[in-house]
Amino acid sequence: MKKRKELNALIGLAGDHRRKKTKQGSGSHRLLRTEPPDSDSESSTDEEEFGAIGNRSRFVKGDYARCCKICCPLCAFVILAACVVASVGLVWMQMALKEDLDVLKEKFRTMESNQKSSFQEIPKLNEELLSKQKQLEKIESGELGLSRVWINITEMNKQISLLSSAVNHLKASVKSAADLLSLPSTVEGLQKSVASIGNTLNSVHLAVEVIQKTVDEHRTTLGLLQGSMENNGSNQILPSPSPPSELDNKSHSESAKQDILYLHNSLEEVNSTVVEYQRQNDLKLKGMSETLSNLTQRLSLIESHVVALSKAEQRTNVSSSTMENRAATLKRESLVTNRSDTVQAQSMKKEDNSNSQVSELREKLQLISALTNKPESNRPPETTDEEQVQNFTSDPSALPEFSQLLRNQIETQVKPLSLPGISSIKDLQDLFHKTGQDVDGMLTYQELWNSLGSAMPRPESLRAFDSNGDGRYSFLELRLALGI
């Protein structure tokens, strides 16, 4: 590039001299050249172009020098200003760092002093915590602590409740003084009722035995009927019988077979009813034995309390607390006796119902025996068997009606109910405790429905086991209803 610039400069300086020489020696050149005169114009144009190029290069060089003169100081000023600003910033940052370092040093010093003081205060705090823990333990389990205060409060509540119950028992004992005088008569009545219950149970056992004997007799009559039917079939194999008599014999034999089947079914149902009655009687006997044991225990308690009361009346210096307790126990025993009276009345009613059912069964069995035991003296010797079958099966609809009646009676009176969630005596006791009552209490249908839900049976089905018809069910009634 430098060589190019030097050539351009030399060409620019030599341009003027050449122009002058061309003007002076244009003729000599023309003489020396072999070219035509028109070539002078071409050479002149070339020279003009070369001169223009030289002038242009000189102008570019001057502009470049001027730009350098302006830009160099400006760049130097900018660089100097940037250096000054950077130095000022560095100085300011150094000052800020020194201040921050001083602040950090002061903080470290304060932290060290605080740590030293905290190390000295830690054992003091531990001692204070231990003392406070000891004070809390004294407050909780000391002689005047919270536990002792709570025990005293509970004891006071118990004493207050005992005093209130004693006052209530005193009030009730004042009212039940007349009942205490009539205790011996009530005890005698209970003994008589227990004896009557035993007699009724014995009569029920005898009735069941009689029913079993009648069932055995009916079985023997059925065997005789079957033998007579077989003899009738053997007698029917005779020569040349008329066609209508054969048809009659076939119809009579079929009807006799149907009647025998009906009799078998009825006897099976009677047997099932007898078994159910035996089961019910066993349950009733168990319940009665339990009630008798409870009654004997309660009677012994009543007698002991009566003796204690008689002795207490003779003594004049008996304390009021013992009198209150005895009056309370006597009131409880009177309530127990009243409940036992109600239970006995219910059991008597149930026994009456069972006796009525047994009498109905006896009547129906007598009807069966009357149907089966027709007199045979007024019959001719040839047609005795056929007439016996005809008389026995003259009313074939009576046997299914009788079996239907027995079935309905079994389903309505013997079939136990089912309560949801109750399958044993313990579950039934839990139900009574859940409703807030003892085993001696009574439950209504609404209380049973509230405790067992919508799966309860209808009130009509439970009403069959309500002996006194008051709409309240005792433990024994629900036990009989469930068959447990």
Curated annotation (Swiss-Prot):
Keywords: Calcium, Metal-binding, Repeat
Residue ranges annotated for the EF-hand domain, each copy included: 423-452, 453-484
InterPro entries in the cross-refs: EF-hand-dom_pair, EFCAB14
GO molecular function: metal ion binding
Biased composition (Acidic residues): 37-48
Binding site for Ca(2+): D466, N468, D470, R472, E477
UniProt KW Repeat keyword: yes
Highest taxon of the lineage: Eukaryota
Region (Disordered): 1-48, 227-255, 313-395
Compositional bias per record (Polar residues), positions renumbered to this chain: 228-239, 315-324, 335-347
Protein name stated in the entry: EF-hand calcium-binding domain-containing protein 14
Species annotation: Mus musculus
Gene coding for it: Efcab14
